[in-house]
């Protein structure tokens, strides 16, 4: 199952990508994908649905961030030796853990706002996943 959120910024709705590559609306089963409902109970409920019976989203204008109101955004720096080498840094012996503002999470095609006075913006992409109980 591949879940996503679609719609205007701040008004995203939950959806699923079905086995035929069509995006289907999940709003009648879950209000959104956020900390309060990303859990095993919700997943079990969603696994019972025949997604092909759900309304198809044909006028998809935007895919939003994967989750609404995440609690934390934890990053690991220089986690690839190639990236460390290209920055001229030593490969760390232990992970470099850092936090990022959750407001920086965007949809896959959203603009990325670079602060006006930024002097050292790194182009690297962060890979994220949601961890829960």
Predicted regions and their residues:
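Glycine-enriched loop-and-adjacent helix/strand subsegments that border the catalytic/binding cleft
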Residues: 70-133
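N-terminal non-catalytic cap/leader segment that marks the start of a structured domain
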Residues: 1-95
């Amino acid at each position: 199952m591949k879940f996503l959120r679609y719609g205007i910024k701040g008004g995203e709705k939950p959806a699923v990508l079905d086995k035929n590559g069509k995006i289907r609306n999940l709003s009648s089963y879950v209000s959104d994908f956020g900390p309060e409902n990303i859990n095993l109970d919700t997943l079990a409920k969603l696994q019972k649905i025949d997604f092909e019976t759900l309304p198809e989203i044909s006028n998809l204008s935007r895919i939003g961030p994967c989750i609404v109101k995440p609690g934390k955004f934890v990053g690991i720096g220089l986690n690839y030796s190639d990236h460390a080498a290209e920055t001229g840094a030593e490969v760390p012996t232990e992970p470099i853990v850092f936090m990022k503002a959750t407001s920086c999470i965007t949809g896959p095609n959203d603009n990325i706002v670079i602060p006006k006075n930024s002097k050292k913006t790194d182009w690297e992409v962060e890979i994220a996943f949601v961890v829960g109980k």
